[in-house]
Amino acid sequence: MLNLEQIQNYFPPQIRENPAHKKYIVKEYIQLMILSFLATSKFVKKITFIGGTNLRLVKGIDRFSEDLDFDCKNFNAEDFAEMSQMVLTFLQRSGIRAEAREKQSEKLTAFRLRIYFPELLFDLGLSAYKEERFLIKIESQNQGFKYTPQMATISSCGFFMSFPVPPDDVLCAMKLSALLSRAKGRDFYDALFLLSQTKPNYDFLTQKQGIHNLTELKAKLIETIEKVDLLHKSKDFEHLLFNRENKDKILNFSEFIKKNELRNGKITCT
């Protein structure tokens, strides 16, 4: 059984004392448990840690993330099924009631597992309803792009591990490609975070979006922004932010892209 008080103590007061953050604190701890288990499994040679939870646990972005996403190579449905069962068994042996409720869709191009934790929030005193849903999704998909993974150190909540991750420029390009494809509010926020640190990999963007250089990237981003309501988008991820006021950063995304330039590939103010 998880010890909520012990888990909360790993987080600074401004995070742990906010009632809205408590279930995300628990989720992050379980994500770390799963990553720690996978880091010592045979599957770690076939998967690379990507997505928003990478930004949170590896890069230190100031928001929670809900899913565990992996790029995978030489990894088939049987591998994912075995990995999924091993993760479930690990959680159950750790004293956590965990159940898989997933039917793979023929239309889905990724391997996906939804792990439900029945009554966990109720047992931890975080919900008055036994039936309140609490889940973590694990998704693995071959991104179809070759790169050499790097080993990143993840140190959080008493866990310490090394895990394969993409180079920063590839991770940035993955996020920009996601933004251009689905335009979620968190994608704009994450893109600002990554572009302040690194340039994107244009080979990836060429393959996925037909973007070859900075000029084309800025044009495509501005075109995308003009089709969405950023005020509305800012509300779809505010619950994940440590400070909800930071959601307003994406409202100036268009001006930021138009008025700033990339020096050495990174976005900097002119």
Q: What label would you give each PLM region?
A:
Residues 1-32, 37-47, 58, 75-270:
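Structured mid-to-C-terminal alpha-helical surface segments
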Residues 52, 59-80:
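Catalytic metal-binding acidic patch
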Residues 52-53, 186:
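Gly/Ser/Thr-rich helix-start
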